[in-house]
Each structure stands twice: as structure tokens, then as C-alpha cells.
Amino acid sequence: MQNKRDSYNRDDLLASSQGELFGPGYPQLPAPNMLMMDRVTKMSETEGDFGKGLILAELDITPDLWFFDCHFPGDPVMPGCLGLDAMWQLVGFFLGWVGGKGKGRALGVGEVKFTGQILPTAKKVTYEIHMKRVVNRKLVMGLADGRVCVDGKEIYVAKDLKVGLFQDTSSF
């Protein structure tokens, strides 16, 4: 694997969406508009609540982001499912970062709670992912807890985020 660092900028994340950051066969992030972060500010294999890995990332909020026009007209708010998807994206990114290969797929979440919202007036969303477990067998899978904050206030909490890496997704 190439480019294993402890932080990544927007250009790096765009390279990941094209399969060019870690190399052929490693999981890719989605391309814009579904790429839900502008930078990864910290990657660690040993930190986090469980000592199994920590990912910190950020998304800059501007009123012209695509989802504010359609969700909802006259009442713009970032869809909560996009914040949840961002957490899955980061778990998959971590799996590639630690050497896992395959196509990333979200497998589920044990529990998710939304206690706030992301409005066009916000400045920054931060994501915090605490890896609980990485299984590296025939199926590479990550299990993590995550939280989303807007301008420093926690608004989403997810438990048991699951992402798998698949060599063949035809039967998935």
C-alpha cells in the first residue's frame, strides 16, 4: 500500500475516490457529491476509545452545498443519512489505510441517534470514529462507534457501524 499517513487533504480524498491514493484493489471513497468530508485530520491505529483506531475528519459547511437546495425547499437541513454515510465512509477508509483490500460496503449500524441538525449557517462538521474491531480474514470488516458534531456540538451518535470489504460484490 502507498500513501499511509496520519492525515489527508481534499486532493488526497479525491484521489481515493478514483482508486489512486492507496493503489489498485484498495477501497475507494465516493466521488463528489457523495464524498462527505473535506479532510481527514487524524488517523491512528492505537488511539480511540477502544485503543483500536481513531479517525477524525471535517466537512466545511457553506450555504451552497447541493443538499440544502432540495432538503427541504424553504427549510434547508443536511440529511441525517449523509452524516451516517460519512461515518461508514470513514470506517471503510480506515480499513484500506490498515491494508485491507476490496470494495467497501456498509453492512449496518447497531444504533443511531440524531439530537441536532446541520443548517446552512453552520461552519464545520467534525466526525469522530472509534474503531472497536477489525476482522481481516476472507471478509475484511470494521466495527466502530462514531459521532458527528456541528460547530463543536454533538448531534449524531452511532454505535456498531459495520463496513465490509468484498472482492466480489455480484452476490451482495
UniProtKB/Swiss-Prot annotation:
Per the record, what are the reactions this protein catalyses? a (3R)-hydroxyacyl-[ACP] = a (2E)-enoyl-[ACP] + H2O; (3R)-hydroxydecanoyl-[ACP] = (2E)-decenoyl-[ACP] + H2O; (2E)-decenoyl-[ACP] = (3Z)-decenoyl-[ACP]
GO biological process per UniProt: unsaturated fatty acid biosynthetic process
Q: Which family does it belong to?
A: Belongs to the thioester dehydratase family. FabA subfamily.
Give the EC number(s) listed in the UniProt record: 4.2.1.59, 5.3.3.14
Q: Does the keyword Thylakoid apply?
A: no
For molecular function, the Gene Ontology terms on record are: (3R)-hydroxyacyl-[acyl-carrier-protein] dehydratase activity; trans-2-decenoyl-acyl-carrier-protein isomerase activity
**Record-level GO cellular component terms:** cytoplasm
Q: Which organism is it from?
A: Vibrio parahaemolyticus serotype O3:K6 (strain RIMD 2210633)
Subcellular locations according to the entry: Cytoplasm
Q: In which pathway does it act?
A: Lipid metabolism; fatty acid biosynthesis
Give the record's subunit note. Answer: Homodimer.
Name-wise, this protein is 3-hydroxydecanoyl-[acyl-carrier-protein] dehydratase
- Active site per UniProt: H71
Provide the function of this protein: Necessary for the introduction of cis unsaturation into fatty acids. Catalyzes the dehydration of (3R)-3-hydroxydecanoyl-ACP to E-(2)-decenoyl-ACP and then its isomerization to Z-(3)-decenoyl-ACP. Can catalyze the dehydratase reaction for beta-hydroxyacyl-ACPs with saturated chain lengths up to 16:0, being most active on intermediate chain length.
Q: Upper taxonomic classification of the species?
A: Bacteria, Pseudomonadati, Pseudomonadota, Gammaproteobacteria, Vibrionales
Q: Which InterPro entries match?
A: FabA, FabA_FabZ, HotDog_dom_sf
What are the record keywords, sorted? Cytoplasm, Fatty acid biosynthesis, Fatty acid metabolism, Isomerase, Lipid biosynthesis, Lipid metabolism, Lyase
